[in-house]
Amino acid sequence: MGLREEIKRRRTFAIISHPDAGKTTITEKVLLHGGALQKAGTVKGKKSGQFAKSDWMEMEKERGISVTTSVMQFPYDDSLVNLLDTPGHEDFSEDTYRTLTAVDSCLMVIDSAKGVEERTIKLMEVTRLRDTPIITFMNKLDRDIRDPMELLDEVEDVLKIKCAPISWPIGMGKGFKGVYHLLRDEVILYQTGKGHTLQDGRTIKGLDNPELDQVLGSDAENLRGEIELLQGASHEFDHQAFLAGELTPVFFGTALGNFGVDHMLDGLVAWAPSPQPRETDKRMVEAEDEKFSGFVFKIQANMDPLHRDRIAFLRVCSGRYEQGMKIKHVRLGKDIRIADALTFMAGDRARAEEAFAGDIIGLHNHGTIQIGDTFSEGEELKFSGIPNFAPELFRRIRLKDPLKSKQLQKGLIQLSEEGAVQVFRPLNNNDLIVGAVGMLQFDVVVHRLKSEYKVEAVYEPVNVSTARWVDAKDPKKLEEFKRKVSENLSLDGGDNLTYLAPTNVNLQLAIERYPDVQFRKTREH
């Protein structure tokens, strides 16, 4: 297969959802359909000796944080799919946001009993930065769910994206019978108890088929009425609008019952884009360019001090990686030979023989690689669009031993370069303030300061609720702003001026009072 064909068959996507919407279960079932797992291990089935392939393995746990979970590659039909995991609950961090900059499409999973939830809203905001195409899976149809029409309306209102239903549920909870596939004009019947295996559901072709009435009884007439209503009230699928991030195809199903996941995957490989062109400071890089290039979007540190390896995750943007090839680390101006990059075939770390645009490879990193770094076959490029996000949680960090302030500063700056947290130094005092988007980030920092930098630190509350990067076109206006609000200003790890607001009201007032100053939620790496 030539370079062009290899790239065209790739689909790189991430799953976004609120915790407990069923993301891990759907990841399992996606891998099951991709032939990567013979029998899906549901997350809760720990006692049955199966546990989730994409959750942390015991062996991985013993030596720190799992890296296998982060990327899973598997074949599906004629495509090769790269699924990037975005962590759930506590380990939610900026990594989650940045992972979304490394994909070409996203699958949004919604708990149909609850509808659109807060984490989903935040993640969707991030996909908007690049108008990423979104496919929606309404999950948990084997439970009592909200009215499906209401769910579509909520997605449209809250997330500002048009919905085009592709499948439609027949019944719900204990009375869930299956779905009607609008594009194929067929009913696919649901069988219970098949959650761990692939099921060939019985299909009935055509809404007017009398067989439907025999199998579904009165539900058949209800379905016909609903579909008629739906066709008048909802959007038809439009591929161009989907690619522009304006419309989402919606599938209904139950990941736990392994039903509907294959319909969604069929849609994903048929409609989601293959690797897309990427913006750099010099030019657009096309995926099919002959020469290799890529950027680092995430660094995974190993929590175990005995294994000081950190893995830098690199999204290949163009060309082909081959084992042992020489590539340029552009920021350092250094050529390096990469002999031991990792690929991630569905949960197993393996030496990468080769990788193509759209694939993710892992580079061993001993502290020289930073988030946002570009690697190329010699060309001086920098990929743009790898942002820092304004943190939402803040703590002041204090040393137990005041004599170690040099080590503390060094440690914090290195950890912030790696994207573990953000560090702010107020202009008016010598405090060090740490900012994060997830609580776990704080624990990781204290742990790593102690094990890697021999610094014992504790946190204290600090009166900061949100942060914005600030700049102004007119230097005089910026100077005046700095004079007037100096008690709210800090420098971040890269010496960028930041406004730390004690409350959201304070921030709004500052934005109104200083119209010539730009307050930004994101900053480029």
Curated annotation (Swiss-Prot):
CDD domains referenced in this protein's UniProt entry, alphabetically: RF3 (cd04169), RF3_II (cd03689), RF3_III (cd16259)
InterPro entries in alphabetical order: EF-G-like_DII (IPR053905), EFG_III/V (IPR035647), G_TR_CS (IPR031157), P-loop_NTPase (IPR027417), PrfC (IPR004548), RF3_C (IPR032090), RF3_dom_3_sf (IPR038467), RF3_GTP-bd (IPR041732)
Annotated GO CC locations: cytosol
PROSITE patterns linked: G_TR_1, G_TR_2
Pfam families for the chain: EF-G_D2 (PF22042), GTP_EFTU (PF00009), RF3_C (PF16658)
GO molecular function: GTP binding; GTPase activity; guanosine tetraphosphate binding; translation release factor activity, codon nonspecific; translation release factor activity, codon specific
One BP annotation, GO: regulation of translational termination
Protein's UniProt keywords contain Protein biosynthesis: yes
Record keywords, A-Z: Cytoplasm, GTP-binding, Nucleotide-binding, Protein biosynthesis
Transmembrane regions listed in the UniProt entry: none
Subcellular location: Cytoplasm
PANTHER family: PEPTIDE CHAIN RELEASE FACTOR RF3
Task performed by this protein: Increases the formation of ribosomal termination complexes and stimulates activities of RF-1 and RF-2. It binds guanine nucleotides and has strong preference for UGA stop codons. It may interact directly with the ribosome. The stimulation of RF-1 and RF-2 is significantly reduced by GTP and GDP, but not by GMP.
Name the record gives this protein: Peptide chain release factor 3
Annotated source species: Hahella chejuensis (strain KCTC 2396)
